[in-house]
Amino acid sequence: ELLIPSIFPTISEDYERVYSDFAITSLCNEMEETIQLLSLQSQKDESLSFDKQQSSNVIDLKKMNKVWSTRFDQLPNNPGILLETLRIRSLVTDVTEMKPQWLRFIEVATNSKCVELSQQTLDYLSEKGMKDDPDLHILKAKLLWSQGNDFKSKAIKYLKQNVDESNPNYYFILGKWFQEEGEYKKAREKVSKAT
């Protein structure tokens, strides 16, 4: 609450200057909500019968997850902010329930050249039961591609070995990569197979 008076008068004047304070305040708010949800979950675990209170707790958790998803969509493409937000939320929400948010984070981290962070996150999600997820394999291939010429053939090979051709993104990704390499005929062939 101490940050609020310093933030709001200056937001209209200089958003960039107060953004870090605003981000800290938002993370504190998320931590408070997480603590409340942990409290609700412990109440649910202590209750042996499925009564109205427990039903209300489940509804509250679903509502909060929906609110969090909407908020996450509005966050800037900053790997640090996205990661801190995901770390807080993962205290109460299963990784598989936050799959779109984790995938966005990996994409942003890869585009920001945070190779090690992207790889660690891919490994973490694999350990959490998403090892065979085709979206994870696509991001792994994109991560390889982003590492430069020495890794591009590995990226194509990895994509072909781990992602089924029936996946709607398979040919689009290959087409995009061939286009980046100036191989327009191959790019056109791949994209035409996707449509």
Locations of regions flagged by a protein language model:
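Extended alpha-helical assembly domains of large eukaryotic scaffold proteins
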Residues: E1-T195
